[in-house]
Amino acid sequence: MSVQPKIMVFTDWYEPGFKAGGPIRSCVNFAAYMKEDYAIYIFTGDRDLGDKQAYLQIETNRWIEKDGVQLFYASPGALNWESILVHVRDIKPDYIYLNNMYSKYFTIYPLLMKRFGLITAKVILAPRGMLKSTAVQYKPGKKKFFFQLLKLLNIPGRIVFHATDSTEEADIKNLFGEAVPTKQISNFPPMQKDLQPIYKESGSLKIIFTGRVHPIKNLAFLLRCLHLVAGSVMLTIVATIEDEGYWLKCREIIESLPQPIAVELRQDVPHQEIEELINAHHLFVLPTLGENFGHAIFEALSAGRPVLISDQTPWRSLQEQHAGWDLPLSNEKEFVRVLQEVAGMDDEAFQQWSAGAWQYARNFMESSNLKEKYKELFS
């Protein structure tokens, strides 16, 4: 029996964490698909985003096995240069997969180790959307300095960047040069579920928004649109409040909404419960400024929920397949029109869009040939 190649995945957060959203799902799905062909080692932190306490009932600072994957949950005291280097040398990975752009321990240290010849593994860096112009505009001074330092040390030329779409690949080459090695492959989505039925009554609409409360996710845009929608509308916001100032602005809009519009905030909801909440709503809405994949979008589609999103994600041409709408944020009136259209749908009309959403997700799974593409990247 041949020995499986080893992939050591560095990520700040992993299950049972959920507050970091998409990056966690990217790593979980990656491990689930790739563990049949590779020995997967996940090196991660021992607590969720923003938490001061470690996960309950999780062994820390030692390798444990779960679902065919090796996991190491490092406490803050175990995160240092010497300890990380020891783990890399003990594992002797063939490949190192980095899942953040700016993390000190989970990205910068491994990059420097590669630069100075302390590790020989092939290094693949997934920026996870952090190089999009809409993301770089936050704290631009520090990020510009960091990019210049990487180029000064010639680190981009010694690794491979994993871009999840053509836009992200263009962002990478714009920052680090056309010659920088890149590979464009979409993220692994979650395994497809059966279509989840829900009844739709004309004049009534249940909307769900999931993600972080942060300007990039653009919740305030959705709330402004709801001001102009007639009918009985329920919006459930499933989110972690990351930007308190932005949330205060959103609350002001919520308090000014007309009476038929109801809004509920559900904070810090574990991933498995988010799936159940998506199933209990008619329409998934995310007017995001930019997503490099959008796991929650795909999860909604795969459950048979049409989506109303911006045109700043990989999920495009939705309307022609009756899966949803991907609209420019410059056209707020069109967002309002679609919300009103869906609110007015009866069950027969809605089920056509529900089936279209589910089929869109199925077509993606059948046509993408993702696993073979990843095996090319890790070769």
For the regions a language model picked out, list residue spans one by one.
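Membrane-proximal helix-turn-helix segments that form the acceptor-binding/catalytic region
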Residues: 143-161
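Conserved donor-binding/catalytic core segment of Leloir-type glycosyltransferases
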Residues: 8, 162, 189-191, 198-217, ...
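Glycosyltransferase donor-sugar binding loop
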Residues: 45-49, 210, 234-251, 267
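Conserved acidic donor-binding segment of nucleotide-sugar-dependent glycosyltransferases
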Residues: 325-333, 340-347
